[in-house]
Amino acid sequence: MYKLVLIRHGESQWNLENRFTGWHDVDLTDTGREQARNGGRMLKEAGFEFDLAYSSVLTRAIRTLNLVLEEMGQMWLPVERHWRLNERHYGALTGLDKAETAAKHGDEQVKIWRRSFDVPPPDVDESSEHFPAHDPRYRGIDKNVLPKAESLKLTIDRVLPYWHDVIRPSILGGKRVIIAAHGNSLRALVKYLDDMSDAEILDLNIPTGVPLVYDLDADLRPIKREYLGDPEAIKAMMDAVAKQGQAK
């Protein structure tokens, strides 16, 4: 049996401001840092140790992973970062206030942009600061490969090759793995691992800073999946995520 731990980054500044973040690089709030540290403490208390860690190339995921490993006394752990684990790209919505966008376009339209499976938001313009080709961390990557906007389906199409080519072989090779990433890139992995339908994944909300632990069989099929922590507190965090795109 194999174990895999997923953790969504702690609260970021744009989470706090209820803005569409996507690939924009923002750091954690003080609350987010404490969420990450608490996640690390829970993992340590539960006896977890890791051999290898993965994260996106965005600061909020990198910072979360660093704080988790610091609390666990595993700062030395090898870490592989890759853009394929980035958050979903929110296109032209990047930086906009979610509630104000809902008030302007309607709750239903914003829900479709945020939570439908295969409808992306409007593309970001190539002249925008939010087009990834302008960011030095994506230097050397064909700009036609970089997204201008993504649905969850497109996010899954981006994430899964990295899972199959890199992460899965590491786990099957005996590595104990933790992945620090984002709400939608982790939803992509959860949908695949749990064989969830397109409809089922729409109702899945992943809380910030809470370790999600998988027990996997020899073929990496889930035997058990559970969050570490208080169930009522975790449910409240999930509910808060679900309400982010609603007009005030």
UniProtKB/Swiss-Prot annotation:
Q: Report the Pfam families cross-referenced here.
A: His_Phos_1
SUPFAM superfamilies recorded: Phosphoglycerate mutase-like
Coiled-coil region list: none
Which GO terms fall under molecular function for this chain's record? phosphoglycerate mutase activity
Q: Out of the domains of life, which is the source?
A: Bacteria
EC? 5.4.2.11
Task: Give the active-site positions.
Answer: 9 (tele-phosphohistidine intermediate), 87 (proton donor/acceptor)
Pathway, per Swiss-Prot/TrEMBL?
Carbohydrate degradation; glycolysis; pyruvate from D-glyceraldehyde 3-phosphate: step 3/5
List residues binding substrate.
8-15, 21-22, 60, 87-90, 98, 114-115, 183-184
- Give the catalysed reaction(s), semicolon-separated: (2R)-2-phosphoglycerate = (2R)-3-phosphoglycerate
Family per record: Belongs to the phosphoglycerate mutase family. BPG-dependent PGAM subfamily.
Instruction: Quote the function comment for this protein.
Output: Catalyzes the interconversion of 2-phosphoglycerate and 3-phosphoglycerate.
How this chain assembles, per its entry, is: Homodimer.
Name of the protein in its database record: 2,3-bisphosphoglycerate-dependent phosphoglycerate mutase
Q: Which organism is it from?
A: Teredinibacter turnerae (strain ATCC 39867 / T7901)
Q: Upper taxonomic classification of the species? A: Bacteria, Pseudomonadati, Pseudomonadota, Gammaproteobacteria, Cellvibrionales
